[in-house]
UniProtKB/Swiss-Prot annotation:
The gene is acyP. This is Acylphosphatase. It comes from Methylococcus capsulatus (strain ATCC 33009 / NCIMB 11132 / Bath). PROSITE patterns: ACYLPHOSPHATASE_2, ACYLPHOSPHATASE_3. Its EC number is 3.6.1.7. Keywords: Hydrolase. It holds the Pfam family Acylphosphatase.
């Protein structure tokens, strides 16, 4: 199991990044959340098997078709098992 905290920079708001990330994470069987930040970045926490988390990170580097990802800050965290689904949260 693996858990990551990710900050995605670039043109990632207003391009369906959150919805697309949530869909991809759910397809991969991951739990966690994604939300927009006031500074224009997207923040997400994902938890699940390591291979699926790595697949989501690879997707995050590209994002949906209209996104232009310029940076990805990834930090591994302790697995907690606190989530039951992957959710899109309200903006901060």
């Amino acid at each position: 199991m693996k858990r990551v905290h990710v900050l995605v920079a670039g043109r990632v708001q207003g391009v369906w990044y959150r919805a697309s990330a949530a869909r991809k994470a759910s397809e991969l069987g991951l739990t966690g959340w994604v939300r927009n930040l006031p500074d224009g970045r997207v923040e997400l926490v994902a938890e699940g098997d390591a291979e699926s988390v790595d697949a989501l990170l690879a997707w995050c580097r590209r994002g949906p078709p209209l996104a232009r990802v310029t940076g990805l800050d990834v930090r591994e965290m302790a697995v907690t098992g606190e989530f039951t689904e992957f959710a899109v949260l309200r903006d901060v």
